[in-house]
Amino acid sequence: MKPQTKGFSQSKPQTRFWRDLWYQKKLALSSTAGFESSGTYWNNRKNVTGLYVKSRTRKSWQGNVDAQLNAMHIPDGARVLDIGGGTGTHAIPLAAKGCDVTVIEPSGAMREQLQENLASSGTGLTILPSRWEDISGSELGDPFDAVIASYSLSMSDIGDALDKMQDCCQGTVHLFWFLSSPSWARVSQDLWPLLHNREYPGEPLADCLWQVLYEMGIYANLIPECKKATVYQTIDEVVREYYQRLSCSTGQQEEILREYFSSELMPSGEGLVLKGNSCSAHIWWNTWNAGSPDQTG
């Protein structure tokens, strides 16, 4: 952290229990047999297009995006950094209201969809084709008024990643992450032993992330968010999605998926949804007052 950051104290050595726990969970996940990293999965144009089309046909999608944008309170004309900005979910609306937006996105497939979305929206922004871990401070330029990382915390050394966010921001940092296991993770935990003869360790969750920040001397707000279930029209649709997601390659694995979803899907007003609920968290703090328990200013 920068020594001049208001409210942040360097006098006590930082403990690393939660930071190391995050690293261990990420390492366990990446070494799981059959696991495909998020970077690999989202560098597939078919996966990106499938998610993009599906999400934007859901009635709840735009409402969720609007709620997140409103919760961040980013003023018109602000200088904004969107880490792992994907197809422009937050970046394009912010650019449309006059913000100077920079998107860091390592996936070529995501950047391709982002460029298409920019062309149709008539807005412009800066795109840096890189991982957050590989970006230098000189590439980022002047400090940002807001930094966003929405479901893009794939980095194993979360402490270094958060340090860099704190250092390049003169306003607020906003992290969106899983508070409870998302539906796809619950499916993976249920099916990975049957498909790959291994346990699925899952992602570290928002409680771990908040504790990492606390260890670093950052008193962040955590606001829970309820997530709407993904709607499918047929069992075939969900089997196709998870056949790819769960690194399947055989007809036997497809039958395991079909049998599982036959019992786990239930009807809703719009189609079929997976049983169970998922919650996420919006974690945010003021970088100029990171060490103060009062983060309302």
Regions found by a protein language model. Give the residues of each.
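Short, glycine-/aromatic-enriched active-site segment of Class I SAM-dependent methyltransferases
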Residues: 179-199, 226
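A short, conserved alpha-helix within the catalytic core of class I
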Residues: 153-168
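Class I SAM-dependent methyltransferase SAM/SAH-binding core
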Residues: 87-134
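Short alpha-helix
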Residues: 202-217, 221
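Conserved beta-strand signature within the Rossmann-like core of class I S-adenosyl-L-methionine
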Residues: 170-181
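Conserved class I S-adenosyl-L-methionine
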Residues: 2-74, 77-86
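Conserved Class I S-adenosyl-L-methionine
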Residues: 219-297
